[in-house]
Amino acid sequence: MTYQQPDAKGFYGKFGGQFVPETLMTAVIELDKAYREAKEDSSFQAELDDLLKNYVGRETPLYHAKRLTDHIGGAQIYLKREDLNHTGAHKINNALGQVLLAKRMGKKKIIAETGAGQHGVATATAAALFDMDCTIYVGEEDVKRQALNVFRMELLGAKVFSVTDGSRVLKDAVNAALRAWVAGIEDTHYIMGSALGPAPFPEIVRDFQSVIGREAKRQYAEISGGKLPDAVMACIGGGSNAIGMFYPFVNDKSVAMYGAEASGLGLDTEKHAATFAKGRPGILHGALMDVLQDAHGQIMEAFSISAGLDYPGVGPEHCYFNEIGRATYDSITDEEALEGFKLLSRLEGIIPALESSHAIALAQKVAAKMSPDQSLIVCLSGRGDKDVMQVKERFEAEAEGK
């Protein structure tokens, strides 16, 4: 049976939906209508395709990581090089698509949230390209962790708003951006950066990011004589690079799908972002999904060395995949991710983002259990330039025995 999700009300099984205040329903309905029309308009897709090719630099390579493969001694590992996109990550695929959509809707202002800063940079980039006013909401903790990306956003002409509410991280930035959207509904479009939020956001983000999996599928077929890979893999916070990799393979039952979530300091601590391992269904940011919550239903703080993965929920389509067993989600600690970061840098000369390093760490475990005639495609969602100073300080502190 062909996979057809979400349903007409934006649900993936029991997950998803539109749990938003009345003040936002108008905007959500307007966005849904505009998106359906854009999908049917070949000129919209043609303009986006042109930008992806000539501005972003797509398609990105599918790279056979031979030294990493030899080191692990199992499946052949291929890297889908989203780190080579303009702005350094997969986020630009969605940001450009949504800015085009905003322009089509006659909006003048763009707002967005960001954690690792990559979505903020991508949104500020797209807004600069289309001469649109842009404000990015960033948790105060992430402003410190990602100072370089904050400067990039400002350089691109965006206003950066430091969010001091709550734990001052990604979920708080989303809250602030949603409030700003309510206040400026007439002329403002909110660009959700991950496959989260009220419908139609998870579907929009999935569709714009599916270019990752579509390209990877075709590229692998070209080098393998028309075959499918045995498995695909990606890191998962909210889940946009993962859904972009998974969705084009969802009907190919022979292809296993693996997501690497962040278990921070460990599942036996409260310092993690392992929503599938430790969460349960709840409503957050306009959708029903698995979330980290205490016994009273209060949203808990997520924790990860990676600013892009410390979100206390995960997109509704991933929740559905997890429930029906279509994808397998495993947890990777900070230490394991740092080992993945070092390993890829030293074996392949590619410095990955800390987010992507979680996928590299999981690839080591999964590939080792596979045979050399099998293949695994890992989405290398972003490059590690933004994380180098943070990792340097971490390694120096460890060397000093702190």
Curated annotation (Swiss-Prot):
The keyword Amino-acid biosynthesis applies. It catalyses: (1S,2R)-1-C-(indol-3-yl)glycerol 3-phosphate + L-serine = D-glyceraldehyde 3-phosphate + L-tryptophan + H2O. Pathway: Amino-acid biosynthesis; L-tryptophan biosynthesis; L-tryptophan from chorismate: step 5/5. CDD domains: Trp-synth_B. It holds the Pfam family PALP. SUPFAM superfamilies: Tryptophan synthase beta subunit-like PLP-dependent enzymes. Its EC number is 4.2.1.20. It is an enzyme of class 4 (lyase). Gene3D superfamilies: 3.40.50.1100. Its cofactor is pyridoxal 5'-phosphate. One of its GO terms (molecular function) is tryptophan synthase activity. It comes from the Bacteria. InterPro entries: Trp_synth_b_CS, Trp_synth_beta, Trp_synth_beta/beta-like, TrpB-like_PALP, TrpB-like_PALP_sf. The beta subunit is responsible for the synthesis of L-tryptophan from indole and L-serine. Tetramer of two alpha and two beta chains. Belongs to the TrpB family. This is Tryptophan synthase beta chain. It comes from Streptococcus thermophilus (strain ATCC BAA-250 / LMG 18311). The gene is trpB.
